[in-house]
């Protein structure tokens, strides 16, 4: 059976693993998912990620990040633009998540960017998700 929204599936797996304090979560891999994991790592929401080449497909293993008192680095992850309703933002109207405490992940002509990076470059795009 095919998956309707692979990104929502990835975010749900991360949220569920994060909720029960798992150290790692495994999702089917794609270039977009690897790019999102890379962006989350650069922003400090996850520890690391790796791609495992298994047959029939590749797997993306994401190491979740917690504080010394088991506090979550990634408190929330929400899918914004969905297959049934795409959400786009102009460069002049980019979203701000929790007053700048979170990030919006945008798919732009310059690749995947956070809302602050897109503001600096002056580009808009599809708002894929919010992370805080």
UniProtKB/Swiss-Prot annotation:
GO cellular component terms attached to this protein's record: ribonucleoprotein complex; ribosome
SUPFAM superfamilies per record: Ribosomal protein S8 (SSF56047)
Ribosomal protein as UniProt keyword: yes
A GO term for molecular function: rRNA binding
InterPro entries xref list: Ribosomal_uS8, Ribosomal_uS8_CS, Ribosomal_uS8_sf
Subunit text: Part of the 30S ribosomal subunit. Contacts proteins S5 and S12.
PANTHER family found in the cross-reference section: 40S RIBOSOMAL PROTEIN S15A
The keyword Ribonucleoprotein is annotated on this UniProt entry: yes
One Pfam family named in its UniProt record: Ribosomal_S8
GO annotation (BP), single: translation
Protein name in the entry: Small ribosomal subunit protein uS8
Family that this chain belongs to: Belongs to the universal ribosomal protein uS8 family.
Record keywords, A-Z: Ribonucleoprotein, Ribosomal protein, RNA-binding, rRNA-binding
Known role: One of the primary rRNA binding proteins, it binds directly to 16S rRNA central domain where it helps coordinate assembly of the platform of the 30S subunit.
């Amino acid at each position: 059976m095919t998956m309707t929204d692979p990104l929502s599936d990835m975010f749900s797996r991360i949220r569920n693993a994060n909720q029960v304090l798992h150290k790692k979560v495994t999702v089917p891999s794609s270039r977009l998912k690897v790019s999102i994991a890379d962006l989350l790592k650069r922003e400090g929401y996850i520890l690391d990620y790796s791609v495992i080449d298994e047959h029939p497909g590749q797997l993306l293993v994401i190491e979740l990040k917690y504080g010394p008192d088991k506090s979550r680095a990634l408190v929330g992850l929400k899918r914004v633009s969905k297959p049934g309703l795409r959400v786009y933002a102009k460069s002049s109207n980019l979203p701000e998540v929790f007053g700048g405490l979170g990030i919006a992940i945008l798919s732009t002509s310059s690749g995947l960017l956070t809302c602050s990076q897109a503001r600096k470059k002056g580009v808009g795009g599809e708002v894929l998700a919010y992370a805080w």
